[in-house]
Amino acid sequence: MAGKLDRLQRSLGHRFDNPALLEQALTHRSFGQPNNERLEFLGDSILNCVVAIALFERFASLREGEMSRLRASLVCQDGLHRVALELDLGEYLRLGEGEMKSGGFRRPSILADALEAVFAATFLDQGFAAAKAVIDRLYDPMIAAIDPGVAAKDPKTALQELLQGRKLPLPTYVMAKVHGEAHAQEFEVVCEVNALNLRTTGRGTNRRAAEQQAAELALAQLRKP
């Protein structure tokens, strides 16, 4: 395990003073205790903060809502999964036998959670500056590729214009589910781009918010290199 972790640490650009933190970050709950669930919680907050700083410093012309949408697209499961794949993070995960047999090392949710846990482990190992350096290193290519003109548009508008530019039919939005009590409902909407066989699911406290998230996820798929 130590040799494999050396490779991962080189990819992260961070050498752990306490390698046990990194091992815990890579340990799924199916493997046993201690696992990475608590680290994932902390890493999510650290990632949101670092990405917010990066967007604030790089895009002085963007408004709060525009930066919030961009941050959401970068720190969502899809964004985390992309970074985790670049790190070959699945190769380093410690999973229970059943989870390993079912392909858990490829599952986007497990990879995304583990990456957030790695960010937390870096923070606990050497502080916020170290965690920020790792996140900046991994996320800079995606942030550098952002077009501020496109970012200023809401996701549904941006997706519509992108498809029109490619001479493709417009997307459709289908209400899939409504969860919760009347005073605290969560809406689930599916965005379908049938010409590309693309389906994404967004969630929000109202239908419009769910549609916007679904469109944002579709955009992220279409903008992949």
From Swiss-Prot:
Keywords for the protein's UniProt record, in alphabetical order: Cytoplasm, Endonuclease, Hydrolase, Magnesium, Metal-binding, mRNA processing, Nuclease, RNA-binding, rRNA processing, rRNA-binding, tRNA processing
Cofactor(s) listed: Mg(2+)
Cell compartment(s), UniProt: Cytoplasm
GO MF annotation terms: double-stranded RNA binding; metal ion binding; ribonuclease III activity; rRNA binding
CDD domains membership: DSRM_RNAse_III_family (cd10845), RIBOc (cd00593)
GO biological process: mRNA processing; regulation of gene expression; rRNA processing; tRNA processing
Reaction equation(s) it catalyzes: Endonucleolytic cleavage to 5'-phosphomonoester
Source taxon at top rank: Bacteria
Residues that coordinate or bind Mg(2+): E40, D113, E116
Pfam family, one: dsrm
SUPFAM superfamilies according to UniProt: dsRNA-binding domain-like, RNase III domain-like
Domain DRBM: 154-224
Entry's Gene Ontology cellular component terms: cytoplasm
Catalytic residues in the record: D44, E116
Enzyme Commission identifier(s): 3.1.26.3
Domain RNase III: from-to ranges: 5-127
Protein family (similarity comment): Belongs to the ribonuclease III family.
Protein purpose: Digests double-stranded RNA. Involved in the processing of primary rRNA transcript to yield the immediate precursors to the large and small rRNAs (23S and 16S). Processes some mRNAs, and tRNAs when they are encoded in the rRNA operon. Processes pre-crRNA and tracrRNA of type II CRISPR loci if present in the organism.
Self-association and partners: Homodimer.
Entry-linked PANTHER family: RIBONUCLEASE 3, RIBONUCLEASE III
Protein name listed in UniProt: Ribonuclease 3
Phylogenetic placement of the source organism: Bacteria, Pseudomonadati, Pseudomonadota, Betaproteobacteria, Rhodocyclales
Gene name of the record: rnc
